[in-house]
C-alpha cells in the first residue's frame, strides 16, 4: 500500500466515515472542490480509497481490467448478497459466471419481457386513485418487484409469490435511512443476537428469503421438461464449457443480487424521472408528443427506440446516479493511473457523481436537459450509470428497457402531477441513493388505455 495516496483528505478517518455514510454526494462535492477530481479518503475500520472523477483515469482502468480485482473490493456487500455472487468474483471464475448469466438479459428474451413490463405497469397503475397523492418511489418499488418476481422467478401467483413480496420489501427497508444504513459499513453493528437486534432481524429475513428461493429452485427441477422463459429457468439450464451447471448456492446468491440490485436501482431511477418530467413542462410536452405519435397499442420494442424517451432516461441516470461510486477496483500490481504511480492493493473507486457533473462534459449539469444526449454521444468513460469495462452491469439492457416502458406506459394512460412544489433531496438508502421522501405525486386523470397487453408470457 502506498504510504501517500493522491491528495489525502486531512481530517480524521472516523469523521470521514460518518460523513461518507451520511451524505456521500455532499462529501464528494466538498473534497473535490478542495483537492480536485482525484483525491483519497480513509474510512475508519474499512480502509483507504482513491476517488477518481477524471474520464482519462476511467478509460485507463476500463482498458486494463485484468490488472484489477473487483470481487475482493466488494466485501462490504457480502453479508447482503452472499459469497458466491458474481459481484464478489474475479478472474476465470467471474468470466465463467458472467457467461452463464448473460443470455437471459439480452437479445430476443428482452422482447418477451417488454410485453410483460407494460402489462405489470398497467396493473399497478390501475390501483392509483384520482386526487389521491401517493409516493412515486414506493409505487415503483412495488412495480419493479413485481417485474422481477414474474420475469426472474416466473411467479405470478401462489403461496410463494405472496410470501416473497412483503418479505423482500421489509428486508430492503431495514436500511432506508443513513442511520439505519450504518450497519452495512460498521462491523461492530453486524452482530446476529436474534431478532431483537437490527442485524439479527436483517439476517433472519435474509435466511427466510433463501429458503423461499431454494424451494422455488427445487420445484423448477421437478418441471425441467417444461419450456419456460423466466430468468431462473434459463439460469438453471445454462452450462459452462465443461458441462457444469450453477450450484444451488450460486443460483440463490445471484437471485438475491438481482433482487437487491435490480429492484432498488430501477425503482429509484423511475421515481426521479417522474419528478423531473412533471417538474419540467417543456420536457413533459415534448415526451408526450413523441408518445402520441405512436398510435394505439405500439410494439414495446418500438417504444424503447424512441429518441426523446431514451434521452430522458439517460439524463435521469446522469443527474441521479443510484450509487455514489462504481464498485471498488483493487490494483493487482504497481500501475500508473492518470499520472499517479499506484502500488499493489490500492483501492480505486470511480465517482459517478463527479463524472456526471463535469461542466466540460455536461454544461449546466444541475439542469435537467435530455437534449444533451441527442446532441452528442458520450464515451464509456464519460457516462457511467451502469459501470464500465468487464464489470458493466449485466442487466443494464433490461433495466433501461424497464425504465423506458414504465415511463411511456404511465404517461400514455394516466395524467400525473407533483403533489408538492418543493425540491427533493438525495438520501442514502443502504448502498444506494434515493429521493428523500420518495417523490409525492397525484393522479389527476385517466386516458383510454393505449398499451393493453393482456397475456402472460410465462406458463
Curated annotation (Swiss-Prot):
Q: Which UniProt keywords apply?
A: Heme, Iron, Metal-binding, Monooxygenase, Nitrogen fixation, Oxidoreductase
The answer on whether this UniProt entry bears the keyword Heme reads: yes
GO BP, one annotated term: nitrogen fixation
Q: What is its EC number?
A: 1.14.-.-
Name the residues that bind heme.
393
Q: Which cofactor does it need?
A: heme
Gene Ontology molecular function, alphabetical: heme binding; iron ion binding; monooxygenase activity; oxidoreductase activity, acting on paired donors, with incorporation or reduction of molecular oxygen
Give the PROSITE patterns listed for this entry: CYTOCHROME_P450
State if Transport is listed as a keyword: no
Q: Note the PANTHER family from the entry.
A: CYTOCHROME P450 (PTHR24305), CYTOCHROME P450 12A4, MITOCHONDRIAL-RELATED (PTHR24305:SF166)
Tell me the function of this protein. Probably involved in alkane/fatty acid hydroxylase.
Protein family membership: Belongs to the cytochrome P450 family.
Identification of the protein by name: Probable cytochrome P450 110
- Which organism is this entry from? Nostoc sp. (strain PCC 7120 / SAG 25.82 / UTEX 2576)
